[in-house]
């Protein structure tokens, strides 16, 4: 499922290829690779921080994808709060829906695991919102 989500986001991302820096492509590919490797080799269960790091990094990349797809530098100076809030909210929402999907279709993890995943998803979304604000201020360069 995670691969399908990244394929869909990648396709949408390619349609707007003029709206994102090349360095972001590497981050996006690393997030997809981290998720795929985690599922293929059982790294989520084997390595203790792998699940948390992957959740935070993936949410960070997905949230930045929203920024590049929907805003792409078209945000006026006085709309910084709206930009940061929407990038954070979209990323956090994706994390919450992922946890719902995981609960119903993958496995019934403990409540502690679900809560910790939601917290690190929020951290990744917050980091993406801060990066989006910095990119808007600097002119969308991520090099």
Q: What do these predicted ranges mean?
A:
Residues 1-60, 64:
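"…centered on the first transmembrane helix and the immediately adjacent amphipathic helix/loop
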Residues 25-39, 83-104, 113:
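Small-polar-interrupted transmembrane alpha-helices in polytopic inner-membrane proteins
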Residues 24, 52, 79-87, 117, ...:
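Residue-level signature of transmembrane alpha-helical entry/exit and packing/kink sites
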Residues 42-51, 95-126:
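Interfacial helix-loop-helix junctions of multi-pass membrane proteins
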Residues 51-68, 91-102:
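Short, conserved structural micro-motifs that define repeat-unit consensus positions
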Residues 11-15, 37-44, 69-73, 96, ...:
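Structural signature of transmembrane alpha-helix termini at the membrane-water interface
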């Amino acid at each position: 499922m995670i691969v399908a989500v990244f394929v869909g986001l990648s396709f949408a991302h390619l349609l707007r290829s003029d709206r994102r820096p090349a360095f972001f492509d590497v981050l996006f590919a690393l997030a997809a690779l981290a998720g795929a490797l985690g599922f293929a080799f059982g790294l989520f269960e084997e390595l203790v921080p792998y699940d948390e790091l992957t959740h935070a990094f993936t949410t960070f990349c997905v949230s930045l994808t929203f920024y590049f797809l929907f805003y792409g530098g078209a945000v006026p100076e006085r709309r910084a709060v709206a930009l940061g809030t929407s990038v954070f909210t979209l990323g956090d929402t994706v994390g919450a829906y992922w946890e719902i999907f995981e609960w119903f279709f993958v496995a019934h993890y403990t409540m502690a695991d679900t809560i910790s995943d939601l917290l690190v998803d929020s951290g990744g979304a917050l980091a993406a919102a801060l990066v989006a604000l910095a990119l808007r201020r600097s002119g969308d360069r991520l090099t």
